[in-house]
């Protein structure tokens, strides 16, 4: 029998999503009579391959095979497949086998599919076509019979393995829609076996005590809100405060997919109804509540939570039934980019302003916060439900909150706490809207401390002391408030952190009846949830609405993800200057109301792009965001938007296909670090193969306003020559890819491939084999699900859509709409590709000779020329300085850099910035040695920036594991072959690059440590943090070996693994010693380990390492803020 492909990662992924996974032969043998063999001597190879590669997966809760199973064939394969497809369509089941088929109706007529009465095909399905005509499947039908094959196709999921490491789905619910059982109700096993973390290496830390298992700190625990009486000793990555009592283990339910849920048996004989999906919730020590807590009356509002009714058929509720379904994070993105007219006032939609300060308004507020009611601004009054006693008693407190809000003078508090930090005359000049005062206006942003003072003052005025309960609770909330507004663009504050150390029993308004000193555990947990709901609303609604009412909050181009708070009065003036400058620079034509209405009513309506600005050091940068204005007939507009997006993705895929097939169309364009590495490596090896290395002349140039200056006529000409030269017909295949990473997280992506009919791989097996042969990593350890395939997309229709996209793009600036008359519409995936194609055509016509014996690179609009001919370098520079109006190409001399002298008269009186002949030449984040052609990384972009705000780090759930994985993932990105290739760089250069990578990792390590929640300290888990540091060296050394195959690097080589560990420890010692109060316990073990490594390393290697770690080479890091 043909040996089955191993594909262990694919099999593991399927086992995590299905109840049972069997090879086809094993599955049939279990059902058939003894002695029946699916594969017999003399069977054709294609059939034996099918049986070996086919996996049968059983869903949770799927029905068993028929009791009277027959192994006789009655129907032909085409008839059987048609019967299964008709049954799936009639039941409206989501099945891969039925993709592209639908039932006939009056609106969609046409001939039915063969052997069916009411099913038509509207898109080809290659899986069906394979089944209908395959001789292997016909032989399989003759061996297993109609009944079993129908059962396999209709009730199971079949997968075919494609060597070496992927598979595709034949039938069953799409894998990307199936959740793992652990995603429904996570269970904690009574005992779990600790495993050694990946990449952890303690061979150089032998002085440490024997580590039993540091992964025990990573083990999952029941989610619990901190409460009084609970010890505060948390493991580093614990998701909660460990309970004093032993966690109760619940059985894991069997999850059934589909619209109808059934009561499924559990191993204990009990039953319950599975929940369709898991929703985030308030973490509690125990999730079920007694009827005394009146859980059925509770539901948090809006996006915070949803309401679940208990099942009447279940005697034992699962641990997450009837629990509060809270969104566990408050995100900073909710208060970014607020719109308004520039007036500093509460928004008309501000919740508290729409409620009367009386008991009726208080009741409405209680319902909105705690009972899930939505704010009602107009319309008839709905029937009100009777409040329980607990919530009825809350009304006076929330009435007082409404009264305090009505009396609070927000504008006066704003002016008091967020004053401008300059002299009055400077402020008066700055508030002028003329462009010369733009820089003064940019400095008038409020600091996070000023914003915190304003918010604190508002909360002190509005929220009474009775709602806080104690000053301790108030201080805890203000501490979290300060942290919240100091987060970066992608920052999140978790509900667990918000409730950390809150004293629930001091909030008497949570009680349903007064005077009880001792309360049941269920009642205490209910009070915890109510308090969590209130604090979540206070931060996520009240504070966020205050910020959106009085500030415009945005990131900048020079401070990574750090947020800047501009008062609305300041930002309105900044925006008016930015709009004026943008209209002067870009050719736009204003549209009338009738034109806008006509544009929106068109079926292929372009999305209306909104223009916003972000600060940069010397002005404002316009950013175009593509969004859809729904307005009336929202459903129709949404369909228009989806249709337009699909066409845009098809056009993008088609241009990428032509670009790959004809690489010369892109000229010298590079699309990323991999392209730069491939091109630069080939150039360096070619130069070093010469008898004598010539002197190289470097030119760096940046095109001014590339996207806005390209003439649309020239762009149409370039694209027309690209896609209309052969009037091709394209085939578009859309498919999904599901894979699981090394941490066990399942990722899904949706892709499309465009080819011509001549290049089409019609069947999935051929298609996946072709993709794996062309790129071994493209589908590694993945499962592919084909969604659709279209074979009639003409190049002329795509070109017409391109013209529509180019000439009908609409930008909304303020309340006015404009259409772009010149340049490339921004905000879409096409913008960069179109710009590269246009400049590539220019290079092919003007700079073909310049690249002789040299190298021309361009990353979008940043040129780099390296040539041994001085006259060619001067010609190239002169051409760009004088401009190429035909392509809208004009460079910015202030950003132009050369390493040779240029006479001022030759360039019209101006001269570019000149560097020495031998220097480190900067280009696109790289430093290129002009003499040796070695490559360093440019870290000057980190100057005066905060690593803490630039690093997106989710620090709540399994914080330690998340921290380790985050650092390792960033390290893998930074350890690029361009810096580690010993054929491009010398050993000394590679050591310098590795040391700087480790030094930046040390800064990231510190940024993660100071963000760890729940008062975590390094001294509480010393072994774990030492393991993280050691794993950085092990991971980097493993990447170094992969980037230098065939080279001797080990103990007898030029760079042993101890060298990587020494550089790593040296970098971390340099950074952590600056924060000795935090890392005092780490410094001693690191120094001891480094001394042990010095004894193992040869003297020559130590000399290279010490030279690489010279502080004079890493002065760029001294200006980093963290």
From Swiss-Prot:
Q: Annotated region QFP motif: where?
A: 381-511
Where do the record's region annotations for Primer grip sequence lie? 923-927
**Motif TFLY in this chain:** 332-337
Required for nucleotide incorporation and primer extension rate (site feature) positions:
860
Provide a Gene Ontology MF annotation, just one. RNA binding
Modifications the protein undergoes after translation, according to the UniProt entry? Phosphorylation at Tyr-697 under oxidative stress leads to translocation of TERT to the cytoplasm and reduces its antiapoptotic activity. Dephosphorylated by SHP2/PTPN11 leading to nuclear retention. Phosphorylation by the AKT pathway promotes nuclear location. Phosphorylation at the G2/M phase at Ser-447 by DYRK2 promotes ubiquitination by the EDVP complex and degradation.
Positions where Phosphotyrosine occurs in the chain: 697
Please list where the region (RNA-interacting domain 1) is annotated: 1-239
Keyword annotations of the record: Chromosome, Cytoplasm, DNA-binding, Magnesium, Metal-binding, Nucleotidyltransferase, Nucleus, Phosphoprotein, Ribonucleoprotein, RNA-directed DNA polymerase, Telomere, Transferase, Ubl conjugation
Which stretches does the entry tag as region Required for oligomerization?
306-528, 907-921
Q: Which GO terms describe its biological process?
A: cellular response to hypoxia; DNA strand elongation; establishment of protein localization to telomere; heart development; mitochondrion organization; negative regulation of cellular senescence; negative regulation of endothelial cell apoptotic process; negative regulation of extrinsic apoptotic signaling pathway in absence of ligand
Question: What SMART domains does its record include?
Answer: Telomerase_RBD (SM00975)
Q: What class of enzyme is it?
A: transferase
Residues bearing Phosphoserine are 447
Give the subcellular location. Nucleus, Nucleolus; Nucleus, Nucleoplasm; Nucleus; Chromosome, Telomere
What's the domain remark here? The primer grip sequence in the RT domain is required for telomerase activity and for stable association with short telomeric primers.
* Quaternary structure annotation from Swiss-Prot or TrEMBL: Catalytic component of the telomerase holoenzyme complex composed of one molecule of TERT, one molecule of WRAP53/TCAB1, two molecules of H/ACA ribonucleoprotein complex subunits DKC1, NOP10, NHP2 and GAR1, and a telomerase RNA template component (TERC). The telomerase holoenzyme complex is associated with TEP1, SMG6/EST1A and POT1. The molecular chaperone HSP90/P23 complex is required for correct assembly and stabilization of the active telomerase. Interacts directly with HSP90A and PTGES3.
- The entry's protein name is Telomerase reverse transcriptase
Species this protein is from:
Mus musculus (Mouse)
The major lineage groups are: Eukaryota, Metazoa, Chordata, Craniata, Vertebrata
């Amino acid at each position: 029998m043909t040996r089955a492909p191993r594909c262990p990662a694919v099999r593991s992924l399927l086992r995590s999503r299905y109840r049972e996974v069997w090879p086809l032969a094993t599955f049939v043998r279990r059902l058939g009579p003894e002695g029946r063999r699916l594969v017999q001597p003399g069977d054709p190879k294609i059939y034996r391959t099918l049986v070996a590669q086919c996996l049968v997966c059983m869903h949770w809760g799927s029905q068993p095979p028929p009791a009277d199973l027959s192994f006789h064939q009655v129907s032909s394969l085409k008839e059987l497949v048609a019967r299964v497809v008709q049954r799936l369509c009639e039941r409206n089941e989501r099945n891969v086998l039925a993709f592209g088929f639908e039932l006939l109706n009056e609106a969609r007529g046409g001939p039915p599919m063969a052997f069916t009465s009411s099913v038509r095909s509207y898109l080809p399905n290659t899986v069906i076509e394979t089944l209908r005509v395959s001789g292997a499947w016909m032989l399989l039908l003759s061996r297993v019979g109609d009944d079993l094959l129908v059962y396999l196709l209709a009730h199971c999921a079949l997968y075919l393995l494609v060597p070496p490491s992927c598979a595709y789905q034949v039938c069953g619910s799409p894998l990307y829609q199936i959740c793992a059982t652990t995603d429904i109700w996570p269970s904690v096993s009574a005992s779990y076996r600790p495993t050694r973390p990946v990449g952890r290496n303690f061979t150089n830390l032998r002085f440490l005590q024997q580590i039993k298992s540091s992964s025990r700190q990573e083990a999952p625990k029941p989610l619990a809100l901190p409460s009084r009486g609970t010890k505060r000793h948390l493991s580093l990555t614990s998701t909660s405060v460990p309970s004093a009592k032993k966690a109760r283990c619940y059985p894991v339910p069997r999850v059934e997919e589909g619209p109808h849920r059934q009561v499924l048996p559990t191993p204990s004989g009990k039953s319950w109804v599975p929940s369709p999906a898991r929703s985030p919730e308030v973490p509690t020590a125990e999730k079920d509540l007694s009827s005394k807590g009146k859980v059925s009356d509770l539901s948090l509002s809006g996006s915070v939570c949803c309401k679940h009714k208990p099942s009447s058929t279940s005697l034992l509720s699962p641990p997450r039934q009837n629990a509060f379904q809270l969104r566990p994070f408050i995100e900073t993105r909710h208060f970014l980019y607020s719109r308004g007219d520039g007036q500093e006032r509460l928004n008309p939609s501000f919740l508290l302003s729409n409620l009367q300060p009386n008991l009726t308004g208080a009741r409405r507020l209680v319902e909105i916060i705690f009972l899930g009611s939505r704010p009602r601004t107009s319309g008839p009054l709905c029937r009100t439900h009777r409040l329980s006693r607990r919530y009825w008693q809350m009304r006076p407190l929330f009435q007082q909150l409404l009264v305090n809000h009505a009396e609070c003078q927000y504008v006066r508090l704003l002016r008091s706490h967020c004053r401008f930090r300059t002299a009055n005359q400077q402020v008066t000049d700055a508030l002028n809207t003329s462009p010369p005062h733009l820089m003064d206006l940019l400095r008038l942003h409020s600091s996070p401390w000023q914003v915190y003072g304003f918010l604190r003052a508002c909360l002190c005025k509005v929220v009474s002391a009775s709602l806080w309960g104690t000053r301790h609770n108030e201080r805890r909330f203000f501490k979290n408030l300060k942290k919240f507004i100091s987060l970066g663009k992608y920052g999140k504050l978790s509900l667990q952190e918000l409730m950390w150390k809150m004293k629930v029993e001091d909030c008497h308004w949570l009680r349903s009846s007064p005077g009880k000193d001792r309360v049941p555990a269920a009642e205490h947990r209910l009070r915890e949830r109510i308090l969590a709901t209130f604090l979540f609303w206070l931060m996520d609604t009240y504070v966020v609405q205050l910020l959106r009412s009085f500030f415009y909050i945005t990131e900048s181009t020079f401070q990574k993800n750090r947020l800047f708070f501009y008062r609305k009065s300041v930002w309105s003036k900044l925006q008016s200057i930015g709009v004026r400058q943008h209209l002067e620079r870009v050719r736009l034509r204003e549209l009338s109301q009738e034109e806008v209405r006509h544009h929106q009513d068109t079926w292929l309506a372009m999305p209306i792009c909104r223009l916003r600005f972000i600060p940069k050091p010397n002005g404002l940068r316009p950013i175009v965001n593509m969004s859809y204005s729904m307005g009336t007939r929202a459903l129709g507009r949404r369909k228009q938007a989806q249709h337009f997006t699909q066409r845009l993705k098809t056009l993008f895929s088609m241009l990428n296909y032509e670009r790959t097939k004809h690489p010369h169309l892109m000229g010298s364009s590079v699309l990323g670090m991999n392209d730069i590495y491939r091109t630069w490596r080939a150039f360096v090896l070619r130069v070093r193969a010469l008898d004598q290395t010539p002197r190289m002349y470097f030119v760096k140039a940046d095109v001014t306003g590339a996207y806005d200056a390209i003439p649309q006529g020239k762009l149409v000409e370039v694209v027309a020559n690209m896609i209309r030269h052969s009037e091709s017909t394209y085939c578009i295949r859309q498919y999904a890819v599901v894979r699981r990473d090394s941490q066990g997280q399942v990722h899904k992506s949706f892709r499309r491939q465009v080819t011509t009919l001549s290049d089409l791989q019609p069947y999935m097996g051929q298609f996946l084999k072709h993709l794996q042969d062309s790129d071994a990593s493209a589908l590694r350890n993945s499962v592919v699900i084909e969604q659709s395939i279209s074979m009639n997309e003409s190049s002329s229709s795509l070109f017409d859509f391109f013209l529509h996209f180019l000439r009908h793009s609409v930008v909304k600036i303020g309340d006015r709409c404009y259409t772009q008359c010149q340049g490339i519409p921004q905000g879409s995936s096409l913008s960069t590709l179109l710009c590269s194609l246009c400049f590539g055509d220019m290079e092919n016509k003007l700079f073909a000779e310049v690249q002789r014996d040299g190298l021309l690179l361009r990353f979008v609009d940043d040129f780099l020329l390296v040539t041994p001919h001085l006259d060619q370098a001067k010609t190239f520079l002169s051409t760009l300085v004088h401009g190429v109006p035909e392509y809208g190409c004009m460079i910015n001399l202030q950003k132009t850099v050369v390493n040779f002298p240029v006479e001022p008269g030759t360039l019209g009186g101006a001269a570019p910035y000149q560097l020495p002949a031998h220097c480190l030449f900067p280009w696109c984040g790289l430093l290129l040695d002009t003499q040796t052609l070695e490559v360093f990384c440019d870290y000057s972009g980190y100057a005066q920036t905060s690593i803490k705000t630039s690093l997106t780090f989710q620090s709540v759930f399994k914080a330690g594991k998340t921290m380790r994985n985050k650092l390792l993932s960033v390290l893998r990105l930074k350890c690029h072959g361009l810096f580690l290739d010993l054929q491009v760089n010398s050993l000394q250069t590679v050591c310098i690059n590795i040391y700087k990578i480790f030094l930046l990792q040390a800064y990231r390590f510190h940024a993660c440590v100071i963000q760890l929640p729940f008062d975590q300290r390094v001294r509480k888990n010393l072994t774990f943090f030492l393991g993280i540091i050691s794993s950085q060296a092990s991971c980097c050394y493993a990447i170094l070996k992969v980037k230098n195959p065939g080279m001797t690097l080990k103990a007898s080589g030029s760079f042993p693994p101890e060298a990587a560990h020494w550089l790593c420890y040296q970098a971390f010692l340099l950074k952590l010693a600056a924060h000795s109060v935090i890392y005092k316990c780490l410094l001693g073990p690191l120094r001891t380990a480094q001394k042990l490594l010095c004894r193992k390393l040869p003297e020559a290697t130590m000399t290279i390492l010490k030279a690489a770690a010279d502080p004079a080479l890493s002065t760029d890091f001294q200006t980093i803020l963290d």
